[in-house]
Amino acid sequence: MDEIVCANTAFRYWRCPPQVRNLYPHLPNSEDGWRVLSQSPFVVDVLKTPIITAASTRSNLHSETRRTIRWNSAYTEKVSIDTGMGFSVTDPLNTLFTMTRSVSSCDLVLAMYEFCGWFSVFKPSPAVDIALEQTKSEEEQYTTESLFELDETQDEIPWKRVHARAHQKDSKNDQSEQQDNGSGNTASGKGTSLWMRKPLIEIEELHRFAAKVKGEMWGKQFYEAARQVMGIAASPLEVAGIMLLSHPRRAGGAEFKNIFVNDLTPLSNSARKIAGQKICYGDIVIVNPITMKAVIIELQGEVIHGSGAVLDHDATRMTALQSMGYDVFLVTHDMLNDHDQLDAIIHSVCERLELRYKPKTEAMRCAETRLRANVLCNWLGIGK
């Protein structure tokens, strides 16, 4: 295929783990016809149709199998890479930029957080899922760190799939984990649609790129979305917490200032003995620079944080931080999804930081409901 795949189609490509892509054959040439191309396994399972490609002319094609968007610089500047699968795709930054015209501003922000974060959301087809489960025991022999290192036989760094914990009963908590099955229960040990990987984009790159394209068509919308990305998140639940706590009150957020995401905190000697490490990372750290007080928000989801061993590590980390005088709030998906519980958390944070608490007006509460629906959405639906 000679055309450059972009926008939502490219977004789905970049969400697909390399070990999944390696299971598929190359795409047929578009000279064989777009109908044949659209029936290839990788398109059916991952890219979906219509395939969105860039066009440097005024011609706009819209069909069941293909759609083009006008983009003058697509074939004059280096904006794409060769996938090795028989087609080229826009790089992650230009993928986000070309998505601007076809997704909501909130979905664009979520996509930016995902590309800048340590996670991706992808649900394999049933056949691919079986193939992945067969290699699950082999993957479990490696640590998270080793999965981020290339060996001599690998072209790309494999991603680490997050598996569900045992005894998960409540389907509501699955909302932040993309509702992996339709029954409302995630099977014990079953692979979820959450994957861990290195960030595709550095957050500084995103902000520089946004400033560069601000004057172009759709550039202002892209720039405004990029301004809302304020840190490097490790899960969709963290993104939801960040946006609900940092967004302006008129937009439904709590409008806390001085928020830091996955902030590094050196531990005291006694805290090191508890945690067994020299430093800890707080999911969301909110600071009052005047009083020099800080609270730490720890986002907790069973599937997000994986195994019981990881949960035990979270507990020791929280205890270590509390021993140093930090107020640590353990927040779940259900708490974020309930106005009264979230409001109580915001009230408590204000008290700890000696900030003035202001109840939300009815209009602000309506805006919060809309924001909550957007950020606690099914992440698999972004870009569809």
Locate each region found by the language model.
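Short gly/ser-rich loop at a beta-strand->alpha-helix junction or flexible surface loop bordering the NTP-binding
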Residues: 1-217, 360-361, 369-384
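Surface segments flanking catalytic/ligand-binding clefts of nucleic-acid enzymes
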Residues: 155-174, 178-180, 185-384
